[in-house]
Design a protein with these regions (language model features):
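Short pre-active-site segment immediately N-terminal to the catalytic Zn-binding motif
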Residues: 138-155, 298-306
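Charge-rich, solvent-exposed alpha-helical interaction surfaces
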Residues: 13-23, 27-30, 63-66, 70, ...
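Post-HExxH zinc-binding segment in Zn-dependent metallohydrolases
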Residues: 164-231, 310
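Pan-zinc metallopeptidase signature
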Residues: 24-45, 210-310
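Auxiliary, metal-adjacent structural segments of Zn-dependent hydrolase domains
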Residues: 18, 40-44, 51, 58-139, ...
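Catalytic glutamate of the conserved HExxH
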Residues: 155, 159-164
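Fold-level signature of zinc-dependent metallopeptidase catalytic domains
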Residues: 52-60, 143-146, 166, 175-184, ...
Length: 310
């Protein structure tokens, strides 16, 4: 029997949902009643005699997450991280845009610039995302407080289970990222930058961050499964451009005698410079190394945007 056929025939999830909702005074109507009341903050009340416990959500949003989780797991057999759902304001969503959803981040002028750009765009259009979710463990979803109850159900299913499953199961996210590590890494990086600003001065740190930002898209640590010898017969980019006359200055510099450098297979420029630059102070090496890890974390998100929205 195909997996699709098994999904179509599987009705056990309905029994699980019934068993869950049977503990509440509104029962199955709890979602329709919230729609009619036009609020996702609709009260969910347990029936008399039902003792509160961790398996019975005490908020409407929590109950939506629980029901969606039953459908995701029992009907579609989706593997996901645990969820954290936060209901946020428009101002908080603009902040999330600026930090790409990360709950902690260091300070830099470029983030303030992005924040102003997003705010101006919002004032013109009054449009913001219904949700943002980040690849972390637990997965953190930010849902707009202006969402209607039905939209809240949709975005929780979409973000907290659709995107969540993609983050957990897609091979690029498995190979390039550690979902449990990104929030602690971001916190450690923020704290390190703050301490360095106090010890070495904001200007010195800012100049380093400017350089790191310029190299971020060229700082991807390739996993072992792609670090392979070039197959015989495969055309490299440099072969395509062989014979092209380059500028004299470039040729003169490129052909200048010097000590050969063994780059190995390291493709993360930030990490390579941090490890090999001869006169770099240790605090700069540490920041560059951590920035290289953050850059690698965002790589699969750029590569899978269409597929992730599936």
């Amino acid at each position: 029997m195909s997996k699709t056929k098994k999904i179509q025939d599987n009705k056990d999830y309905i029994k699980s949902i019934k068993a869950l909702l049977n503990n509440y005074q509104d029962g199955w109507d709890v979602f329709i009643n919230a729609k009619n009341a036009r609020t996702w903050d609709y009260p969910v009340l347990l029936k008399d005699g039902v003792a509160p416990n961790a398996d019975l959500p005490n908020t409407w949003v929590g109950l939506v997450e629980k029901v969606c989780g039953i459908i995701a797991k029992e009907k579609y057999d989706l593997d996901t991280y645990k969820n954290t759902i936060e209901i946020i304001t428009a101002e908080q969503m603009l902040d999330a845009y600026t930090s790409v959803g990360l709950p902690v981040n260091y300070e830099h002028w470029s983030f303030a610039k992005k924040r102003m750009q997003h705010e101006q765009e919002y004032k013109r259009t009054r449009n913001l995302a219904f949700e943002i979710v980040i690849n972390s463990d637990p997965a953190i979803a930010y849902c707009m407080e202006s969402n209607s109850p039905m939209m809240q159900i949709l975005v929780i299913a979409h973000a907290s289970f659709g995107h969540n499953n993609f983050f957990r199961d897609n091979y690029m996210f498995k190979q390039y990222t550690d979902a449990a590590d990104i929030v602690p890494l971001s916190r450690d990086l923020r704290d390190l930058i703050y301490e360095c600003e106090k010890r070495f001065g904001r200007k010195e740190v800012e100049q380093l961050l400017d350089s790191c930002h310029a190299l971020q898209t060229h700082s991807i640590s390739e996993p072992e499964f792609v670090k392979k010898e070039t197959p015989a017969g495969k055309i490299e980019d440099r072969d395509i451009f062989s014979g092209v006359n380059l500028q004299d200055n470039f040729n003169r510099i490129a052909n200048k005698p010097g000590q050969p450098i063994d780059c190995g297979q390291e493709q993360n420029l930030l990490k390579y410079i941090a490890e090999n630059a001869p006169h770099l102070p240790e605090w700069k090496r540490k920041i560059m190394d951590m920035m290289g890890e953050v850059a690698t974390y965002f790589h699969p998100q750029r590569q899978t945007q269409v597929m992730n929205e599936g």
